[in-house]
């Protein structure tokens, strides 16, 4: 019996039609112009002279650019099949892609020609691209990291696919009304998405609920069958992901949920119009929003349904693609078919959301393909890698056993069997140790039985990585210590990175041009070349040009701030000569926006006390979303806006201190904020932030960092040098040592400026109509134990901010440090991170597409 390898591309007919020559559409302005006009007339049925908005030209341009991507896209897939490349499949519930047009033009080398083509048609590129909505596929750093990784995998030429869900409404659109966050649907798909291509021919059926039937096969083996299920269809939508300066165009495949039977004609004819579409609504709810609220039982069920729907459809697709290439014609199922699976397939789990892929692959191999358990487990473990993104215990997913058993009965059986074998292995390795067994078990028996998804991902993977050196140390030493003691070689670090194409070349053209003029353009694909800037850090001419570029970006950001506040019906003046002090990220207590607010209030009090001459003028910029059910984070947003209203209305603070909260923080807004920032606030409690990538984006754009020794800040300090970063606060070890004896009230009583600021918050100074509004924040700090040690780090933070102010007064010193920060970002490219994944986890090499 021989294994037959099918080397034809998917769906290729026996006698393929003659295809057009590659790049036949042309990459010049005239060809692009013809493409734009053609799509306006023949796709959109619009005459150019009748177009009266930017949407139609945007769509026509996007389709013209996509046409050129597709030529390379098809060639890329043909090359992967011909070369029999090992594929990498990146599974993430989030992809914070931002806008596709600008990034696509840069990566395809079409920016200048496209600008020229639009100009000849009477449009400006900067106007047309504003018509594009940010893709509503992510929330925070997890999704943005995934997007950077896709860019790097395509640029480096790895045969890779991103898999995710096609959310109808994303996370939410954030509005600020009377200082409070109001969530409204993010209708990013309301006008369609010109970049995606639906693939209804590749849809799969995903099962839920039902039961498990046991029987014996002809060989006397126990066979399990999942029966009486409620099914949903998964339909894929593909988006091309072009690499920079290469012929490679990879794929992001997103699943949409559809009902098996979308419309019940009998119910409709009986007058039950709602019931007629009930199945459709129930199915489509799976992909309605990212992270439905888990504060109610229905929300928890929907979240679990999302996660399983995602991994089931994805694994069916991966196995379909594999079996097309490696299959026995005389034995369509069995172990031999999957002999090469782990050699040709690498699956990376981005956090625990896709962890159900472990029991799902086991179910597929054992129940559907007839493999023995041990062989299936060997393949499963050799296929998966797991990336952890948190050290916070409450953020490690755990699902009620009762819920898993009801929705996924066969998977719970498989999880139980994996757990039984795991605990036997633990006992054989360490002897009788009930405490260790309880900690390592896949089932948490305390406070209601729950499935520990992180433990499941660790046990089912051959690699477990953290995303910063400190983060990985904490995982090995504390969070997953038992697993590290059992499998030390399984754990490794892969410090996060960002793509310099989006976060410098695209978002900051003035600085990108200046860097290229100074050291050449090689940094775009080899960030190590930024180190060459260090030799020019004291050059006066470069310093002058550097400040000019920063001021240009500050003016652009100031315009954005004023425009957004005008849209909210508020007048605001921004001093472009002030220090732009920025903290934009998800609103969470551990990220300590509260510490920043306390500093702002302290500065405000100094101004009111007549000490304005000693204070460097600042514009303090906040941004970020709070989870809809996270009431404390939402209260912090109200506090920030309350402080902003008070400070900005006081003549004592005019031109000296301005406080801003930019609503609906997203990638396209970040591309305006990051280049204009001068001080980057990375002030989480040490030992709580896994890595962070915002710190890298700001550093790459010349902002100096004020931060704790947390996450990637530790490595940034090593790269830029102690003199070029502002470090304060307790270390992770000091935090752990202090917690058991920490009395926040003592700090409050011993720091008069702190006590004054806290009392103002609790006394209604920033909520005059509701004096007790912010009392819960004060209670959390003073009587709730101050869990993230905000008060403990206050004095150190204030002293560090004084050092910031002193340095900022000396513009040449600040500029030199800014240049050295950019030079020090050489390590933090997602290209470097992806190479490490490829070499050390996935075992893949680049595939050159001609």
Segments and roles (model prediction):
Residues 2-850:
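A conserved ligand/cofactor-binding region detector
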């Amino acid at each position: 019996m021989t294994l037959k390898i099918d080397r034809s591309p998917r769906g290729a007919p026996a006698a393929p039609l003659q295809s057009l020559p590659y790049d036949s559409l042309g990459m010049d302005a005239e060809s692009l112009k013809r493409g734009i006009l053609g799509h306006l007339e023949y796709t959109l049925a619009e005459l150019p002279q009748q177009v009266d908005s930017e949407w139609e030209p945007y769509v026509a341009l996007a389709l013209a650019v996509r046409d050129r991507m597709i030529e390379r896209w098809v060639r890329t897939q043909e090359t992967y099949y011909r070369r029999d490349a090992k594929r990498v499949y990146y599974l993430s519930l989030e992809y914070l892609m931002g806008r596709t047009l600008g990034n696509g033009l840069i990566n395809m080398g079409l920016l200048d020609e496209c600008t020229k083509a639009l100009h000849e048609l009477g449009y400006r590129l900067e106007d047309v691209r504003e018509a594009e909505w940010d893709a509503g596929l992510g929330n925070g750093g997890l999704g943005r990291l995934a997007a950077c990784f896709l860019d790097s995998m395509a640029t480096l030429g790895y045969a890779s696919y991103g898999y995710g869900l096609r959310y109808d409404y994303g996370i939410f659109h954030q509005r600020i009304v009377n200082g409070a966050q109001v969530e409204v649907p993010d209708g990013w798909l309301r006008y369609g998405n010109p970049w995606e291509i639906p693939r209804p021919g590749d849809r799969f059926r995903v099962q839920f609920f039902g039961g498990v039937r046991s029987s014996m096969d002809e060989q006397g083996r126990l066979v399990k069958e999942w029966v009486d299920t409620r099914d949903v269809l998964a339909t894929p939508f593909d988006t091309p992901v072009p690499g920079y300066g290469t012929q490679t165009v990879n794929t992001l495949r997103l699943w949409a949920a559809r009902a098996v039977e979308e419309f019940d004609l009998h119910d409709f004819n009986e007058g039950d119009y709602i019931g007629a579409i009930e199945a459709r609504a129930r199915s489509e709810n799976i992909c309605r929003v990212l992270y439905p609220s888990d504060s109610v039982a229905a929300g928890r069920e929907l979240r679990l349904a999302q996660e399983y729907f995602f991994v089931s459809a994805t694994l069916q697709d991966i196995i379909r693609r594999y079996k097309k290439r490696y299959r026995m014609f005389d034995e369509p199922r069995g172990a031999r078919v999957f002999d090469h699976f782990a050699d040709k397939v690498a699956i990376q789990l981005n956090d625990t959301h896709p962890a159900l892929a472990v029991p799902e692959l086991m179910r597929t191999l054992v129940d559907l393909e007839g493999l023995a358990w041990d062989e299936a487990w060997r393949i499963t473990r050799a296929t998966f890698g797991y990336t952890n993104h948190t050290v916070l215990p409450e953020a490690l997913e755990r699902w009620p056993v009762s819920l898993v058993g009801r929705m996924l009965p066969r998977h719970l059986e498989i999880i139980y069997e994996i757990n039984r074998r795991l605990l036997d292995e633990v006992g054989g390795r360490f002897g009788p140790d009930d405490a260790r067994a309880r900690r390592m078990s896949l089932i948490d028996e305390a406070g209601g039985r729950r499935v520990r998804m992180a433990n499941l991902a660790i046990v089912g993977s051959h690699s477990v990585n953290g995303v910063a050196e400190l983060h990985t140390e904490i995982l090995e030493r504390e969070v997953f210590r038992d697993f590290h003691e059992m499998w030390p070689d399984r754990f490794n670090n892969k410090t996060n990175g960002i793509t310099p194409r989006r976060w410098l070349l695209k978002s900051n053209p003035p600085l990108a041009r200046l860097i290229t003029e100074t050291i050449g353009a090689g940094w775009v694909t080899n960030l190590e070349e930024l180190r060459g800037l260090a030799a020019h850090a004291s050059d006066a001419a470069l310093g002058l040009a550097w400040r000019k570029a920063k001021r240009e970006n500050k003016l652009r950001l100031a315009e954005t701030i004023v425009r957004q506040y005008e849209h909210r019906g508020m007048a605001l003046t921004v001093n472009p000569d002030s220090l732009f002090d920025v903290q934009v990220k998800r609103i969470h207590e551990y990220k300590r926006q509260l510490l920043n607010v306390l500093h702002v209030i302290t500065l405000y009090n100094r101004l009111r006390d007549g000490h304005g001459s000693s204070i460097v003028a600042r514009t303090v910029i906040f941004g970020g979303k709070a989870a809809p059910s996270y009431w404390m984070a939402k209260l912090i947003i109200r506090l920030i806006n309350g402080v902003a209203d008070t400070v900005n209305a006081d003549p004592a603070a005019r031109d000296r201190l301005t406080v801003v909260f930019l609503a609906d923080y997203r990638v396209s807004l970040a591309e305006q904020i990051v280049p204009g920032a001068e001080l980057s606030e990375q002030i989480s409690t040490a030992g709580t932030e896994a890595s962070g990538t915002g710190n890298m984006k700001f550093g790459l754009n010349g902002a100096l960092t004020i931060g704790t020794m947390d996450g990637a800040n530790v490595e940034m300090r090593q790269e830029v040098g102690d003199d070029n970063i502002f470090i304060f606060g307790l270390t992770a070890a000091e935090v752990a040592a202090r917690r058991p004896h920490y009395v926040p009230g003592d700090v409050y009583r011993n720091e008069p400026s702190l006590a004054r600021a806290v009392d103002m918050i609790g006394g209604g100074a920033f909520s005059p109509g509701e004096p007790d509004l912010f009392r819960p924040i004060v209670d959390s700090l003073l009587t709730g134990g101050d869990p993230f040690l905000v008060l403990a780090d206050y004095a150190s933070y204030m002293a560090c901010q004084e050092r910031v102010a002193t340095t900022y007064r000396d513009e040449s010193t600040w500029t030199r440090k800014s240049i050295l920060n950019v030079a020090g970002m050489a390590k933090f490219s997602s290209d470097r991170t992806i190479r490490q994944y490829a070499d050390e986890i996935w075992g893949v090499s680049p595939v050159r597409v001609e």
